[in-house]
């Protein structure tokens, strides 16, 4: 769910599109979803995956440009989100996703966990390039500009212009925490603000979250990733409550 509507994506691997077929059946036929806008055409030839979509607020979304999500797919999604009358999204931020180990999507590097608090991999904060998408003058078109102000300010603007709290667990390139980042430390499933489902094996990261005032629910990484994906992208909600 994004901005009051749903994105039914085109997966990179053909066999995984059957998962989206099931979701499309639910959205099309279940009365709870009657009239729900659809922002992306599942039959598109351009790939877009849910792990690259991170909701930042009711009016802003981050979209990862990665090996699994193409720029043309982001253009199509941006047009729907920014121009459809049923969408609450006014700003979209495209963030280039680092390619590090087996982490493929934006949600493996960035997780909103409580209002203005985010877990961020220093690799993303340090190296990623970002672009701001807004409505252009001509109806249906999108204006893109490079963001030069850094990730913290981007997230601050997306959540209301106030300073945000960024939590990192140390340098993801070196030291013992490098294993935990590769093991999904920054890919967190928020059950509610400050109430987090995390990979049990990431002991240092989970301790840091507790020290930051979060409630953690450790689950084995084998269980969290049993569907061949990250904990967030495998559990994207079909309904969201306003905060």
Q: Predicted segment positions?
A:
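The feature marks the mature, well-folded catalytic cores of soluble enzymes
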Residues: 1-243
């Amino acid at each position: 769910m994004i901005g009051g509507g749903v994105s039914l994506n085109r997966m990179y691997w053909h066999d995984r599109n059957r998962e989206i077929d099931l979701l499309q059946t639910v959205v099309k036929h279940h009365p709870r979803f009657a009239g729900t806008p659809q922002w992306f055409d599942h039959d598109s030839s351009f790939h877009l995956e849910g792990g690259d979509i991170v909701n930042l607020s009711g009016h802003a979304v981050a979209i990862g440009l990665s090996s699994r999500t193409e720029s043309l797919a982001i253009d199509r999604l941006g047009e729907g989100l920014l121009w459809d009358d049923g969408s609450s999204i006014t700003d979209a931020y495209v963030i280039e996703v680092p390619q590090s180990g087996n982490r493929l999507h934006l949600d493996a590097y960035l997780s909103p966990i409580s209002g203005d608090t985010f877990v961020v991999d220093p690799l993303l904060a340090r190296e990623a390039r970002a672009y701001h998408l807004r409505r252009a003058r001509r109806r249906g078109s999108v204006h893109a500009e490079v963001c030069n102000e850094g990730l913290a300010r981007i997230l601050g603007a997306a959540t209301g212009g106030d300073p945000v709290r960024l939590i990192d667990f140390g340098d993801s390139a070196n030291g013992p925490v490098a294993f935990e980042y590769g093991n999904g430390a920054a890919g967190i499933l928020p059950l509610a603000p400050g109430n987090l489902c995390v990979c049990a094996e990431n002991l240092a990261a989970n301790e840091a979250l507790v020290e930051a005032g979060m409630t953690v629910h450790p689950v084995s990484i084998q269980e969290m990733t049993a569907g061949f994906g990250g904990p967030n992208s495998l559990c994207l909600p079909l309904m969201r409550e306003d905060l």
